[in-house]
Amino acid sequence: MDSIWILSLLFFIIFLLLAAFKRKNHGKHRRIPSPPGFPIIGNLHQLGELQHQSLWKLSKKYGPVMLLKLGKVPTLILSSSETAKQALRDYDLHCCSRPSLAGGRELSYNNLDMSSSPYNEYWKELRKLCSQELFSANKIQSIQPIKDEEVKKVIDSIAESSSLKNPVNLSKTFLALTTSVVCKAAFGVSFEGSVLNSDRFNKLVRDTFEMLGSFSASDFIPYVGWIIDKFNGLQGWRKKSFRDLDAFYEQIFDLHKEEKEVGSEDLVDVLLRLEKEEIVVGNGKLTRNHIKAILMNILLGGIDTSAITMTWAMAELAKNPRVMKKVQAEIRNQIKNKERISFDDTDKLEYLKMVIKETWRLHPPTPLLLPRDVITEFEINGYTIPAKTRLHVNVWAIGRDPDTWKDPEMFLPERFNDSNIDAKGQNFELLSFGSGRRICPGLYMGTTMVEFGLANMLYHFDWKLPEGMVVEDIDMEEAPGLTVSKKSELVLVPVKYLDH
């Protein structure tokens, strides 16, 4: 009898141990919520033209940690500030590499740039080099005279339109402004210069963005995807974009044959000097291909995003006259009757900064952060994320998360009053520039461009809707692409402010 009790007790203990082990094992390897898919294509059919919106809708059903099978690629989608914080802060080192994607690989001379390079010693040395030589605070401040000059040209042009009571296409105006600033700072050539004075340059940039934002089967379906890209014309489009950009870089190099003194150099001068000094990056010396890859980042990363933000901000202000009046009152009270706004003046404009943050919240230029590649396994919300998983953070969804933001669909800059939230990468509610090791190195330049550009537009002019148009007519639909701009161009009528 005693042996039966002992045996029963032993079986009971074994049962408890097995149950505990099972619970522990189940907690470690819980199945990540995932929508059902089809063979070969997986969940690709569930992605619409505006992928961030499609993923946002799916996350409402499957949660802030969601696994998709995009073709043959396991892809993790994070849609909340808390899960983004875990990935980009707590486990940044586990997932800070990049997948090698066909478009980026082609244009970056086989991933020689900062954006698409995998995480390795080469990337770390390149990032350090660019941070010191190209994106330091001193370097950014040194190009302020260029911003002053280009903004003055824009203000003078708008003043002429105002005197004739002509409407202004702000989408084109902001794009021309940022293009002029970037080209002059980086290449030493005005947008009106001989190399850039044509529709060809604008078309080159537009076509490149469109190509990079197009669906590439080779990124999702190994072995046969390239065949699809070849037959639908994408492969040829990639090669043409590469040839056109490469020819543009060679034109820029031709304009920099004469050396300049240190201190008067543009960014190309700096890079060519470093090449001549035989600076070592990774396992080899800095070459022309390295320089071209870096210029690709500056060209595509610096032009579009700031223009998009300024356009969305003005569209929201036009839709919200109360906010428009309030931000203009702040600017005009602070600036008084000065003829021009200086860079230092923008530091005083707290409400303008709130307007810009609110614009980034609702309209992040890059709604899905560039994909990361998981290097080593880690855990989010109890789910194990395996190595070789592709990871996306849906910044657009985070900006509309009702658990983070009250009335998330409302444009309400006051929500940032008495708030420490900013877009510098430490607050995961607002990730316009990313976070962690892969944060955008042009954060400071982009922020100052937007602040300075908008401050001048709102100081010098009142803005009215074209005749016959009402607030409800302002279309806020998004255009698909790698970056997400306003689908219809923003056209407003400037009225010169006469108190200065």
Curated annotation (Swiss-Prot):
Its cofactor is heme. Heme binds at residue 440. SUPFAM superfamilies: Cytochrome P450. Pfam families: p450. Its EC number is 1.14.-.-. It is found in: Membrane. GO terms for cellular component: membrane. It is an enzyme of class 1 (oxidoreductase). It is a single-pass membrane protein. Gene3D superfamilies: Cytochrome P450. The chain crosses the membrane at residues 1-21. Its main location: membrane. Belongs to the cytochrome P450 family. This is Cytochrome P450 71B26. It comes from Arabidopsis thaliana.
